[in-house]
């Protein structure tokens, strides 16, 4: 199945991709081997330095940070998806006074880093009497930033539904709103579900900006823990592995959902002579 953004690579392009993948893998493995060698030379791999992470109190503290990360990510995602759906419908509206502001919001917010929005909520809003609780100082800017991305995902899903589906709803007497709610949106939601999960992975990583507002998410908890026990490298390696496991699991879920979409077949390995 061809991609909307680029053509499917031919035999030569696939061969170059395989060569680049192998070369990149070898380079990464070489860097990892060099890093392990340096860690070993400086005593960072000594068992005594890793022994604290075999105890429950350490993991209980890190898992508490992971729970705070997950909570912030879930609430941010829920708000961003609700706002994104409203923006997507606004961009598809026939009324200019709705369509233009929605389009302006999406185009503007997509160019603003989430960190800048965090600084706005942290420093600018309190000057005007709006000092949010610590949790919302992280959640609000993440929701505002990701709403634009979810809006484009939902809009693409709505536009991918065949025009005849909406026309059939209108033909049986449904109003445009009922047609969108009962016929178009359910189909669009199923089609964009893998993209929603992928965007949620990025949102989960963005919760690491919580260190700016001193919100006790996973990365901030790791920073506090490393300051307390002096095991800087070990702590951040463990935190990185936790992020790796969680994000890899979500990415796997996105691929599974993509493969189970109606009309989508898993890619087959093809061999061609060059």
What are the residue ranges of the model-derived segments?
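Transmembrane alpha-helices and adjacent helix-loop boundaries
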Residues: 1-274
């Amino acid at each position: 199945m061809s991609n909307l953004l680029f053509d499917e690579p031919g035999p030569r392009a696939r061969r170059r991709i395989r060569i680049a993948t192998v070369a990149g893998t070898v380079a990464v493995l070489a860097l990892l081997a060099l890093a392990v060698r340096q860690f070993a030379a400086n005593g960072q791999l000594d068992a005594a330095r890793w022994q604290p992470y075999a105890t429950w109190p350490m993991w209980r503290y890190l898992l508490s940070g992971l729970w705070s990360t997950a909570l912030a990510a879930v609430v941010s995602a829920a708000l961003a998806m609700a706002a994104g759906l409203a923006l997507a419908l606004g961009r598809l509206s026939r009324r200019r006074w709705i369509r233009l502001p929605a389009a302006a919001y999406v185009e503007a917010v997509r160019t603003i880093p989430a960190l800048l929005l965090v600084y706005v909520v942290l420093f600018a809003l309190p000057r005007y009497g709006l000092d949010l609780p610590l949790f919302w100082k992280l959640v609000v800017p993440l929701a505002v930033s990701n709403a634009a991305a979810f809006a484009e995902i939902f809009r693409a899903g709505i536009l991918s539904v065949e025009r005849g589906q909406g026309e059939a709803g209108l033909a049986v007497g449904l109003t445009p709103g009922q047609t969108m709610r009962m016929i178009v949106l359910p189909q669009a939601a199923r089609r964009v579900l893998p993209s929603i999960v992928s965007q949620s992975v990025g949102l989960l990583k963005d919760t690491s900006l919580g260190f700016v507002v001193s919100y006790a998410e996973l990365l901030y908890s790791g920073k506090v823990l490393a300051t307390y026990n002096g095991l800087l490298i070990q702590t951040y390696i463990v935190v990185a592995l936790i992020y790796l496991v969680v994000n890899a699991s979500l990415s796997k879920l996105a691929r599974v959902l993509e493969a189970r979409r109606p009309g989508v077949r898993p890619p087959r390995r093809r061999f061609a002579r060059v």
